[in-house]
Curated annotation (Swiss-Prot):
Hemolysin-type calcium-binding repeats lie at residues 372-389, 390-407. It holds the Pfam family HemolysinCabind. This is Lipase. Residues 1-23 form the signal peptide. Keywords: Calcium, Hydrolase, Lipid degradation, Lipid metabolism, Metal-binding, Repeat, Signal. One of its GO terms (biological process) is lipid catabolic process. It comes from Pseudomonas fluorescens. The keyword Signal applies. Its EC number is 3.1.1.3. Ca(2+) binds at G318, D387, D396.
């Protein structure tokens, strides 16, 4: 089974579903973490950390930092999203659905019951060339808010219901209490347009991922069972449903993804918590400044240690997990493969640190290791086993430590150099064209009147 294979869809259909779910999830944040991502990329978490913070503030002030359009999610007729311009048709979503709840100028839907009113969700549609509705996408935003209320909204959106219900209770009740009416309206709208639950994709990140798991758990007993066959992909969810109804995607070194034992809080939640679950990816590592630094790792790995949260950012998931999807090694990867990703590697750290499997704060890694580089000039080091190394773009330096590694050079891979290479009777392969994920995708856009 491939890393992101879901239900019985097959590899190519699962890839398309994953790409759509990622696009929907990133859209729900309206590019919220762009400021930090830019500052971190330029300055990292070391001595440049203060510059990273300055970049966050600067990015949130500058008109030029408005969220761009996300390819594959907006309709052809819809102009790029900006903070000042209301996109054509966006506000029509609520009226098109026949929904009377709270909605803002962006078309974002808000929680319906007291104590949950700052929860936020998006409803998007996918259409054919004739304008016929093909699929509906539901995206739940994580514990955050729009950029203009960056502090106040997160403080209200998730903590209050979490304190009241606890993880297990929150997971069971979140969707019913926050968007029960909206989800009924969407189900009625979908049925009126000839769609079934199989035509609905539900996605979200962090607390939004928890909402995805909550909706999946309730899908058979609520909303007349309409959503029982829907597709559920959650990113960085602190809770993971049992069974295979939800694909829970997360980094091994994301403290939020590893906070709970399924839906139970225990003492291990405050430290290293690496239990495998049926519905989760368990060995994908975001090789970032924190993971690589011996100094940063003197502090305990914990959800209470804010420096570990660099692996939790939406942008880290959008870029990193897409690298897995587009890798030439994808066919060789499985759900339990050890995969090291470094697209969230800052420029200062990239210049003098070797990307490798450090196996930090986790159960021992076994089997083959896949290391996928970034678009920059990476230093990549294989281990003693049979590693699969793909440098990516840029001029990479790759160190071979075993003589049993497989190297993939594809597309615009730059001027790469291998040191310590020990031939074992066969050569690394060099395709003439970049491996591609050749699937037909239609854009997601607002529900139309």
């Amino acid at each position: 089974m491939g890393v992101f294979d879901y239900k019985n869809l097959g590899t190519e259909a699962s890839k398309t579903l994953f790409a759509d779910a990622t696009a929907i999830t990133l859209y729900t944040y309206h590019n919220l973490d762009n400021g930090f991502a830019v500052g971190y990329q330029q300055h990292g978490l070391g001595l440049g950390c203060r510059h990273t913070g300055r970049g966050v503030a600067r990015q949130h002030r500058l008109p030029g930092s408005d969220p761009p359009a996300f390819p594959g999610i907006l309709t052809r007729k819809r102009p790029p999203w900006t903070r000042c311009t209301q996109p054509v048709g966006r506000q029509s979503s609520a009226s098109a659905l026949g929904y009377g709840g709270k909605v803002d100028a962006r078309g974002t839907f808000f929680g319906e019951k007291a104590g949950y009113t700052t929860a936020q969700a998006e409803v998007l549609g996918k259409y054919d060339d004739a304008g016929k509705l093909l699929e509906i996408g539901i995206g739940f935003r994580g514990t955050s808010g729009p950029r203009e209320s960056l502090i106040t909204t997160p403080c209200r959106s998730g903590q209050r219901p979490a304190r009241r219900a606890g993880p297990q209770g929150l997971c069971e009740k979140l969707c019913r209490r926050t968007f029960g009416g909206l989800l009924k309206t969407v189900a009625d709208y979908a049925g009126a347009h000839g769609l079934s639950g199989k035509d609905v994709l539900v996605s979200g990140h962090s607390l939004g991922g928890l909402a995805v798991n909550s909706m999946a758990d309730l899908s058979t007993s609520k909303w007349a069972g309409f959503y029982k066959d829907a597709n559920y992909l959650a990113y960085a969810s602190p809770t993971q449903s049992a069974g295979d109804k939800v694909l829970n995607i997360g980094y091994e070194n994301d403290p939020v993804f590893r906070a709970l034992d399924g839906s139970t809080f225990n003492l291990s939640s405050l430290g290293v918590h690496d239990k495998a679950h049926e519905s989760t990816t368990d060995n994908i590592v975001s090789f970032n400044d924190h993971y690589a630094s011996t100094l940063w790792n003197v502090l305990p790995f914990s959800i209470a240690n804010l420096s570990t949260w660099v692996s939790h950012l939406p942008s880290a998931y959008g870029d990193g997990m897409t690298r897995v999807l587009e890798s030439g090694f994808y066919e060789q990867m499985t759900r339990d493969s050890t995969i090291i990703l470094c697209p969230t590697w800052s420029d200062p750290a990239r210049a003098n640190t070797w990307v490798q499997d450090l196996n930090r704060n986790a159960e021992p890694h076994t089997g083959n290791t896949f290391i996928i580089g970034s678009d920059g000039n990476d230093l990549i080091q294989g281990g003693k086993g049979a590693d699969f190394i793909e440098g990516g773009k840029g001029n990479d330096t790759i160190r071979d430590n075993s003589g049993h590694n497989t190297f993939l050079f594809s597309g615009h891979f730059g001027q790469d150099r291998i040191i310590g290479y020990q031939p074992t009777g066969w050569c690394s392969r060099a395709p003439t064209a970049a491996p591609t994920c050749a699937t037909t995708r239609r854009p997601w856009g607002p529900i139309r009147c």
